[in-house]
Each structure stands twice: as C-alpha cells, then as structure tokens.
Amino acid sequence: MAVVYAHVSDDILAVSLERVCLQNHVSIPEDLSIISFNNSLFARSTSPQLTSIDINSKQLGIEAASQMINHIENPNLVATKIIVPHQLIERDSCCKING
C-alpha cells in the first residue's frame, strides 16, 4: 500500500484522526503519515507520538503583544512583518517514502 500523508491544522484534530485510523486498522505511519501543528502536549501523549510543527507560540505571543503596544503608543505606525522561527519536531507518526 502507498504511504499517504496528512497535514492536520492542530494537534487535537490530529489526535482524533490518529484514533479513527487505528480503529479502522489504518497503520500509522506505515499506511498514513501524520504531521500536526502546534507541538502541544497532545502531540507527545499519543501512541505513536505525533510529528508536529512547533510554532514557537511563546515568542509569537511576545511579538504580538509588542506590536499591539507599539500601535497603541503610536497609532500612525505601520505594522511590520515579523517572522518567528518554527521547527519540525520529528516523532513516530511519519516515515520516509521509499522510491
């Protein structure tokens, strides 16, 4: 069987997907590789553990608060683009595609 990939927008949804797959005898990661988003506690508490993208939520919050404070203090200030580093946390819900 070909390996299928699912990128799920949130760890909680990925946990639900993982549960449904296992109930229907879909093997993770052999039949379906799952990558989730947020790298929350949920990603680490499943079996197999979910591969997840860590969006660096603490830094994201700091930058958002800073932007809001700057805008309140200087209403004419133009918003600036800020890129917060993210990281792929590889766990057990993905496998390499051979071929």
Language model features by range: what are they?
Residues M1-G99:
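Flexible loop/turn connectors
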